Amino acid sequence: MRNFSVFERFSKAFKDHPSLTRILVVSTISGGGLIAYSEANASYGANGGAVVETGTKKKKVVLLGTGWAGTSFLKNLNNSQYEVQIISPRNYFAFTPLLPSVTCGTVEARSVVEPIRNIGRKNVDTSYLEAECFKIDPASKKVYCRSKQGLSSNGKKEFSVDYDYLVIATGAQSNTFNIPGVEENCHFLKEVEDAQRIRKTVIDSFEKASLPELSDEERKRILHFVVVGGGPTGVEFAAELHDFVTEDLVSLYPRAKGSVRITLLEAADHILTMFDKRITEFAEEKFSRDGIDVKLGSMVTKVNEKDISAKTKGGEVSSIPYGMIVWSTGIGTRPVIKDFMKQIGQGNRRALATDEWLRVEGTDNIYALGDCATINQRKVMEDVSAIFSKADKDKSGTLTLKEFQEAMDDICVRYPQVELYLKSKRMRGIADLLKEAETDDVSKNNIELKIEEFKSALSQVDSQVKFLPATAQVAAQQGAYLAKCFDRMEECEKSPEGPIRMRGEGRHRFRPFRYRHLGQFAPLGGEQTAAQLPGDWVSIGHSSQWLWYSVYASKQVSWRTRVLVVSDWMRRFIFGRDSSSI
């Protein structure tokens, strides 16, 4: 037990962590706005956005999954005409960005979870089944499930559920790349249970290393923690573990002092490759100062019970003894999704292919979002002839500047990559785009654009078609978007509000999904965080850590979890992290 009193620890916390005062101020100031926001949403759900129920039979929506995508869909759905059946083996939502904090006791596991039955609009008829879907049958509109509790209500472990609409938000599983020994010997960090197991293993490692008869070599092996994967999750866990060891465990386990090592293996040339170069360089330098051994260009080839084999790009193979490995190298497809993909002719893909409205290609009334799906953004050049023909209203074979402008308005809505291309090239408008068409004088209003010039102007925009990252931010936006589509399904069936159909007549029912990147964080330990926000804005250091606290507190799905998470942060500042092995 520590020799500090509560008051001494409190004083030490404020002295060692001057940011604590600012965190309290930020939390207090932002609290009023968050309350107002929550109350505004509650009012909208009760009155402004409600749909008056008629005597018609409710459409049944089956929602598979209670992760970011599924929970966002459930929270934002506000139409009483639906009966929502939630099916998931997990009866709660987990705030996964804080899982690295759970592994080291910075935040408690129960603080980042919210029971799924507490989530959702009051006017929407919802029910939950704790079961795992193992088969989807699009022909009969059924999903087949296996109860987690052993038996279902009719005495059988397996049962089926009918649907009118199916929303697939099952997420993904950790990708082992079929490397021998990974499944048997590594810890993953995808679920709350994973974080709890890691935390217990860390404490058990220190307890084992404190035994008197242990050799120095064995003690060093037990206290060697290896992280595979230099993405945000792997980097944040390594940083959290370093803080846990240096701030709490070393003083509690004197035998362990000098024997603890943390190694980060990354197959690429740098860690945090999805971040700005400035963040990547700072993270690598900070880890070097902190004593975290970052091995770049190292690819794991095999994992044994007590050592891991890694190969460099030069072909050199080394054996690294370890006490615990955390595997954080990417995501793979769940078995139920693989089976479904084979049924609908998508067997060679890594994720379900959807269109821009999140509809699974080759199916009816089935939607997929989050990590289990990827959007197949249609390319402009696939429709360029049809676009030109529709824009050429007088059938003259050329487009006037006005016709081109009107066509571009529709194109920008239907094909998000056009707007991204204009921004990437820092183009101010249509005139800049026309310069690439090699027209004589783009300043003239009587310009006439032939189809070859039209194609030339749009030839490069498809270079901005990119797969969306598998992040909570993407999944949450997709869930909110799909909920709004469902809310307005009947209304938009009669009066479509989407872009003009380039092939065919009329309009699409809805505007296609468009992802808005709001920024990303990379906590690096020592009360320092790297933040990359839209507009090429990069901030690194203690100030970004305060922003991280504020944003992550505000993004909690309930006031219960928000209060618990902030309380855990305060507890850690004052009392330190809990080192008990429970």
Curated annotation (Swiss-Prot):
Binding positions for FAD per the UniProt entry: 60-90
Topological relation to the membrane, as annotated: Peripheral membrane protein
GO CC annotations on file: mitochondrial inner membrane; mitochondrial intermembrane space; mitochondrion; peroxisome
Record-level Gene Ontology MF annotations: calcium ion binding; NADH:ubiquinone reductase (non-electrogenic) activity; oxidoreductase activity
Gene3D superfamilies, sorted: 3.50.50.100
Cofactor(s) for this UniProt protein: FAD
Induction profile: Follows a circadian regulation; up-regulated in a diurnal manner. Accumulates in response to ammonium but repressed by nitrate. Induced by chloramphenicol (Chl), paraquat (Par), rotenone (Rot) and salicylic acid (SA).
Record keyword Thylakoid present: no
Keyword check for Calcium: yes
Subcellular location: Mitochondrion inner membrane; Peroxisome
Transit peptide endpoints, chain numbering: 1-38
Binding site for Ca(2+): 392, 394, 396, 398, 403
InterPro entries: EF-hand-dom_pair, EF_Hand_1_Ca_BS, EF_hand_dom, FAD/NAD-bd_sf, FAD/NAD-binding_dom, NDH-2, NDH2-like_C
Predominant localisation class: mitochondrion
Co-factor binding details: Binds 1 FAD per subunit.
EC number: 1.6.5.9
One protein family per Pfam: NDH2_C
UniProt keyword annotations, A-Z: Calcium, FAD, Flavoprotein, Membrane, Metal-binding, Mitochondrion, Mitochondrion inner membrane, NAD, NADP, Oxidoreductase, Peroxisome, Transit peptide
Broadest EC class assigned to this enzyme: oxidoreductase
Residue span of motif Microbody targeting signal: 573-582
Activity regulation: NADPH oxidase activity is stimulated by calcium ions.
pH dependence: Optimum pH is 6.8 with NADPH as substrate and 6.8-7.8 with NADH as substrate.
Tissue: Mostly expressed in seedlings and roots and, to a lower extent, in cotyledons, leaves, stems, buds and flowers.
Function text: Alternative NADH-ubiquinone oxidoreductase which catalyzes the oxidation of mitochondrial NADH does not translocate protons across the inner mitochondrial membrane. Calcium-dependent NAD(P)H dehydrogenase; more efficient on NADH. Binds calcium ions.
The name this protein goes by in its record: External alternative NAD(P)H-ubiquinone oxidoreductase B2, mitochondrial
Gene: NDB2
